[in-house]
Amino acid sequence: MALLVLGLVSCTFFLAVNGLYSSSDDVIELTPSNFNREVIQSDSLWLVEFYAPWCGHCQRLTPEWKKAATALKDVVKVGAVDADKHHSLGGQYGVQGFPTIKIFGSNKNRPEDYQGGRTGEAIVDAALSALRQLVKDRLGGRSGGYSSGKQGRSDSSSKKDVIELTDDSFDKNVLDSEDVWMVEFYAPWCGHCKNLEPEWAAAASEVKEQTKGKVKLAAVDATVNQVLASRYGIRGFPTIKIFQKGESPVDYDGGRTRSDIVSRALDLFSDNAPPPELLEIINEDIAKRTCEEHQLCVVAVLPHILDTGAAGRNSYLEVLLKLADKYKKKMWGWLWTEAGAQSELETALGIGGFGYPAMAAINARKMKFALLKGSFSEQGINEFLRELSFGRGSTAPVGGGAFPTIVEREPWDGRDGELPVEDDIDLSDVELDDLGKDEL
């Protein structure tokens, strides 16, 4: 099994990696400084790949993406964003895995996810299909270019997703909710509020889609709902406050553009997201997919069930789940297996010499790993992971230089282990007298 840690060539385990594209390619490199100008304000159709240099799938896509860019040159724009480097852009568009491809067509504020094949031909076909749709939209009177968002509440595509709150509805909707709320307190006559309105509306639709409704954007007319305005000390307009279950509201002091609002909302979503899954290694697909789709993959090898029983194993799993929650912002993968269940994995990582339980982390792209040498406890594992995230810790090459073979097995059923039952031997036909004579 392999764990994925951004690795280091010399002393450091984590290494800054160059992007996958260069200025000589037909793929246009996009960054936070040029994205709005190149893509959002453009009349062109854009295909944009969000990638991470360490991602194996991204590396395999690179030549096909370049091929498509060359074929579509001067017809459709093909770009790429190093989302590992430019977190804000990835977060703005809800990028959770790599590579993610989005098509920016007639409505640049609502890009579509590309779900097609990863070959140059499939990408070109999808681009031409999207281009045909863009032309149809223009024939039908829909704009294919940049929208400054000055239409106010006439922007029906996003108006519906801003939740209007009142003195009567606020507590039930916001304070009793498990969701995160961003609430704008406004005055209808306020010029700044009018400027914010279309940005807030567009952000509401995007945030609703990307967080599955877990972060909500709302608005309160503070000139009408004066109980709320007084309760939260509203003195100027617009004032935006963030409400989270069990916490005091805090002021939002970020930018007032759609992208700024969306970025903050996605940060809040990440903070409140459930911890990553802790998966048992029962086949090669789980092992490889978890490692290749995450920047870092953490694997624990727990003692045999006969050594710990269900209670002992569950106590180890609880520690791992707690740490997975603590490090969830890192977007790491978490795996576990039983001692002896994946022998090639243990051999490749040098696990077993220190006894069980054990833990390791691997940079799958460079096939290097770091081994937990401290105690397998919450404190010991936390120190190990913290050192890795700071780029410290010793590493070694994975044995064999390749992803270890993973054996398919049944998942743990959650119960105590049972010793194998020995078959009773039938001695009824044995002639004891004859045996005695033979021995003599």
Curated annotation (Swiss-Prot):
Secretion signal, residue range per the UniProt entry: 1-19
Catalytic reaction annotation: Catalyzes the rearrangement of -S-S- bonds in proteins
Any single GO CC term annotated in Swiss-Prot or TrEMBL for this entry: centriolar satellite
Any single biological process term in GO: protein folding
Location within or outside the cell: Endoplasmic reticulum lumen; Cell membrane; Melanosome
Gene Ontology MF annotations: protein disulfide isomerase activity; protein-disulfide reductase activity
Gene3D superfamilies per the UniProt record, alphabetical: Glutaredoxin
Keywords: Cell membrane, Chaperone, Disulfide bond, Endoplasmic reticulum, Isomerase, Membrane, Phosphoprotein, Redox-active center, Repeat, Signal
One protein family per Pfam: Thioredox_PDIA6_C
Modified residues (Phosphoserine): 129, 156, 158, 428
Disordered: annotated segments: 141-161
Predominant location category: endoplasmic reticulum
This enzyme's EC code(s): 5.3.4.1
Thioredoxin domain sequence ranges: 20-133, 154-287
Site (Lowers pKa of C-terminal Cys of second active site): 256
Compositional bias per record (Basic and acidic residues), positions renumbered to this chain: 152-161
Subunit structure, interactors included: Part of a large chaperone multiprotein complex comprising DNAJB11, HSP90B1, HSPA5, HYOU, PDIA2, PDIA4, PDIA6, PPIB, SDF2L1, UGGT1 and very small amounts of ERP29, but not, or at very low levels, CALR nor CANX. Interacts with MICA on the surface of tumor cells, leading to MICA disulfide bond reduction which is required for its release from tumor cells. Interacts with ITGB3 following platelet stimulation. Interacts with ERN1; the interaction is direct. Interacts with EIF2AK3.
Identification of the protein by name: Protein disulfide-isomerase A6
